């Protein structure tokens, strides 16, 4: 044994998890919502994420920020969850180019939703339709991470992330306002 006190280690692990859960819990819920449309499956995914984050703090060595660590763990769990779901229920995911060329995938009911809810539903649908690597980049960007931090989480270069973000933002902007700024 390496001489570490397991009780002390568990206490540190619990404290780190409690802090991360308080700091990033809402972001983890948004991430689960982006990866899973089914409410029951989304709850399962969120539980899997929280368990994985808690377990991961036993290995956390501080080489990156806790924020980056939590997002990396959460996105890895979400991607694994999506892969398992696709094996059991195949679903057509879109590349960035296919998304740009396709029509609006949402069927909003304008009488039942406000404009903000409609926009959020459209954005969520567009994000869910993306292939997992693009979805991961968008979600991290929406959580306020910079390209360098996103690159750390995704295992890409900051330049590749910046390029992807530029393309993703352009596609999403076009999908929200296809005729330009004068057409709504």
Predicted regions and their residues:
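Arg/Lys-rich amphipathic alpha helix in sigma70-family domain 2
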Residues: 59-61, 72-94, 104, 108, ...
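C-terminal flanking helix
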Residues: 25, 29, 50, 131, ...
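Residue-level preference for hydrophobic side chains embedded in well-ordered alpha helices
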Residues: 20, 24, 28, 32, ...
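A short, charge-rich alpha-helical start-of-domain segment used by transcription regulators
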Residues: 4-30, 40-43, 54
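DNA-recognition helix of helix-turn-helix
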Residues: 75, 79, 147-178
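Amphipathic alpha-helical segment used for protein-protein interaction
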Residues: 19, 23, 106-138, 143-152, ...
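C-terminal edge and immediately downstream basic/flexible tail or linker adjoining helix-turn-helix-like DNA-binding
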Residues: 2-11, 15-17, 97, 153, ...
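Structural recognition of an alpha-helix C-terminal capping motif at a helix-to-coil junction
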Residues: 44-51, 55, 64-76
């Amino acid at each position: 044994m390496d001489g570490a006190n397991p009780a002390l280690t568990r206490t540190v692990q619990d404290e780190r998890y409690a802090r991360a859960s308080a700091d990033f819990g809402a972001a983890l819920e948004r991430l689960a919502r982006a990866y899973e449309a089914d409410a029951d499956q989304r709850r399962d995914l969120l539980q899997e994420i929280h368990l994985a984050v808690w377990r991961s703090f036993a290995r956390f060595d501080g080489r990156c920020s806790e924020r980056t660590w939590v997002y990396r763990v959460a996105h890895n769990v979400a991607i694994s969850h999506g892969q398992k779901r696709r094996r059991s229920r195949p679903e057509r995911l879109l590349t960035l180019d296919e998304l740009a060329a396709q029509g609006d995938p949402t069927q909003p009911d304008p009488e039942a939703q406000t404009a903000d809810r409609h926009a959020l539903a459209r954005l969520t649908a567009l994000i869910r339709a993306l292939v997992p690597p693009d979805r991961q980049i968008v979600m991290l960007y929406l959580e306020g991470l910079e390209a360098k931090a996103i690159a750390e989480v995704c295992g890409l270069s900051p330049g590749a992330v910046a390029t992807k973000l530029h393309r993703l933002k352009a596609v999403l902007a076009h999908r929200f306002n296809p005729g330009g700024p004068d057409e709504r």
